[in-house]
Amino acid sequence: MAQRILTLILLLCSTSAFAGLFDAPGRSQFVPADQAFSFDFQQNQHDLNLSWQVKDGYYLYRKQISITPSQAEIAEVRLPAGVWHEDEFYGKSEIYRKRLNIPLIVNQAASGATLTVTYQGCADAGFCYPPETKTVPLSEVSASTVAKSTPSPVAAQTEETPQPAARLPFSALWALLIGIGIAFTPCVLPMYPLISGIVLGGKQRLSTGRALLLTFIYVQGMALTYTALGLVVAAAGLQFQAALQHPYVLIGLALVFTLLALSMFGLFTLQLPSSLQTRLTLMSNRQQGGSPGGVFVMGAIAGLICSPCTTAPLSAILLYIAQSGNMWLGGGTLYLYALGMGLPLILITVFGNRLLPKSGPWMEHVKTAFGFVILALPVFLLERVIGDEWGLRLWSLLGVAFFGWAFITSLHARRSGMRIVQIILLAAALVSVRPLQDWAFGATTAQTQAHLNFKPITTVDALNQALAEAKGKPIMLDLYADWCVACKEFEKYTFSDPQVQQTLGDTVLLQANVTANNAQDVALLRHLNVLGLPTILFFDAQGHEHPNARVTGFMDATTFSAHLRDRQP
């Protein structure tokens, strides 16, 4: 009896094994969207909780979640912070794994009110789902008791999402380095001996400990001003984040930072009005140097006097803080920025002017280099408006300008070993110019032929017509969307391969762009029984699909070529 049971188990296992062995390599192993992202909601009067159970190996994009009420009014939606995910085409994005809860406050809802919830996610294996839309029916509630119930969800959300502070170390490190770099610009460095003497109250003989204490207090006073500024901007940034998505705002900010960068190049001077600077200077002069209280006030006032060299970098940091809307990030980043500016002052005060580099043209070079750093911000902002292709050309132009300037500047250096640096800078400039060269003179023949010539279709009727017009040739239908990372990988790495192109030489190539996910896109996907993208379908000469040849998920050129050969008669 035991032997028969064992034999039966072995038969079942072998059946499963052979089924997997002969399973088509392109067959979908992905679950439907409702199983990958199980959505649910609960409403208790004014409290509404939206929840997702995310399957292992899948994730939701934070930026793709939208919540729109109909015949109802809800409090401001604050999405929890996610974890960072990075890919080649979209850079860094925040995503949610495992479980996501979004508590909401329904201020009031009429009879028949609804909430439209849209979300979109992908699988780690390289498969993305179209945006899903769910309609949440709301119970009728009045606005009478909303004031009492409003604070609880915000508090709960704050407890669940302490993660933004975790991003502080990397950002703070850059702020610290920028502060140190600003200290060596021509507007700041020559002032340090004078500031050092004022801080010490003109007393030349002070113990090292006393001098260190007074200078540190001065720097803390300066840091207090910057930290307060960071907190204010971060608080205002909570309302600023939505505005940053508007093209006109992005273009306006790009123009502002371009002007700030030009000020770093010396085209004009940007500083506080002279009357205000004079008042602040007089207030600072009334303080008594050499005393902790007076030194602290002097430092706080000094933080208000923005020199021409500090205005542009400070504005760039403030934009970053405003975009984050994070109070800890805002205060901490500017505190360390001020600390970076103060470190050289502490060293000079304690160890004397012998540590101070000699003034010279190199300080102007530092200021100009910061101008190029500031110019990166307009490119970053405009890239969201003009798209990746033109964004790459702007980055290319900025790279050529920076490396070209650095190369020309290095020609005046007389130090040994600069020849190697010059070669590296020249090579970097030549590499940076490539996208501009392709744009101005056209890509090479090989590059021009690097993409397959797809015929676009948009509807089920257009697909049926294209299948009828194939004239006895096999057909390949590629389903594409801009939000599909693996679709872009197919374009760059698979469809550009000469072997793949040669194999598809006699195949009619169709492509449906379902980025908009509108009604006709949804109808097409439903007609083809497609769960998500990338999905590639193959039809025979009679217009019938080969179901076992369907591809879901990314394939590299070698694997895809083998798949194409296997489906050939």
Swiss-Prot record:
Keywords: Cell inner membrane, Cell membrane, Cytochrome c-type biogenesis, Disulfide bond, Electron transport, Membrane, NAD, Oxidoreductase, Redox-active center, Signal, Transmembrane, Transmembrane helix, Transport. Disulfide bonds join C122-C128, C187-C309, C484-C487. It is an enzyme of class 1 (oxidoreductase). The keyword DNA repair does not apply. It is found in: Cell inner membrane. Residues 1-19 form the signal peptide. SUPFAM superfamilies: Thiol:disulfide interchange protein DsbD, N-terminal domain (DsbD-alpha) (SSF74863), Thioredoxin-like (SSF52833). Residues 430-569 form the Thioredoxin domain. PROSITE patterns: THIOREDOXIN_1, THIOREDOXIN_2. The keyword Electron transport applies. InterPro entries: Cyt_c_assmbl_TM_dom, DsbD_gamma, DsbDN, DsbDN_sf, Thiol_diS_interchange_DbsD, Thioredoxin-like_sf, Thioredoxin_CS, Thioredoxin_domain. The chain crosses the membrane at residues 168-188, 213-233, 248-268, 301-321, 328-348, 362-382, 391-411. It comes from the Bacteria. It is a multi-pass membrane protein. GO terms for cellular component: plasma membrane. It catalyses: [protein]-dithiol + NAD(+) = [protein]-disulfide + NADH + H(+); [protein]-dithiol + NADP(+) = [protein]-disulfide + NADPH + H(+). GO terms for biological process: cell redox homeostasis; cytochrome complex assembly. GO terms for molecular function: electron transfer activity; protein-disulfide reductase [NAD(P)H] activity. Its main location: membrane. Its EC number is 1.8.1.8. Required to facilitate the formation of correct disulfide bonds in some periplasmic proteins and for the assembly of the periplasmic c-type cytochromes. Acts by transferring electrons from cytoplasmic thioredoxin to the periplasm. This transfer involves a cascade of disulfide bond formation and reduction steps. Belongs to the thioredoxin family. DsbD subfamily. HAMAP family: DbsD. This is Thiol:disulfide interchange protein DsbD. It comes from Citrobacter koseri (strain ATCC BAA-895 / CDC 4225-83 / SGSC4696). The lineage of its organism: Bacteria, Pseudomonadati, Pseudomonadota, Gammaproteobacteria, Enterobacterales.
